[in-house]
């Protein structure tokens, strides 16, 4: 499980989108078009300048298990009340139930964006020379 607290560390910023367009204008324009709603949403509701990239991080973890780290724990999903749909993680083993999930708690945004850009732009990592500066901003 990769929760929103972790995926929210992966933000496709306007600078990253511009860099993507410079490397491959067609793909960059497409990615900008499909993320525009989210760029606007995150700014309007949270004042985040960029698009939080949730699902691609979960997929990237399966391609590179070093992308994220975490712990094995028992996880249950609340099915009623105000917390309906929330994941309840017993990280301390309080309920003494067998772990049924890997809960990812850390990620490496630079490692993610190297893979993300490399795969969607079909470029080798060495061609992504400015990426580190843009991700660490």
Task: Kindly give the residue locations of the regions a language model identified.
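N-terminal acidic, glycine/proline-rich low-complexity segments
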Residues: 1-137
């Amino acid at each position: 499980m990769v929760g929103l607290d972790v995926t929210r560390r992966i933000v496709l910023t306007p600078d990253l989108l511009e860099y993507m367009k410079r490397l491959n204008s067609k793909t960059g324009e497409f990615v900008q078009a499909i993320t525009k709603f989210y760029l606007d949403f995150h700014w309007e509701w949270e004042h985040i300048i960029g698009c939080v990239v949730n699902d691609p991080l979960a997929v990237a973890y399966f391609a590179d298990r070093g992308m994220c780290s975490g712990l094995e724990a028992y996880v249950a999903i609340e099915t009623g009340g105000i917390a309906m749909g929330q994941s309840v993680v017993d990280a301390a083993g309080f309920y003494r139930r067998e772990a049924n999930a890997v809960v990812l708690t850390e990620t490496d945004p630079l490692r993610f964006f190297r893979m993300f850009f490399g795969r969607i732009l079909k470029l080798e990592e060495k061609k992504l020379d400015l990426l580190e500066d843009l991700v660490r901003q």
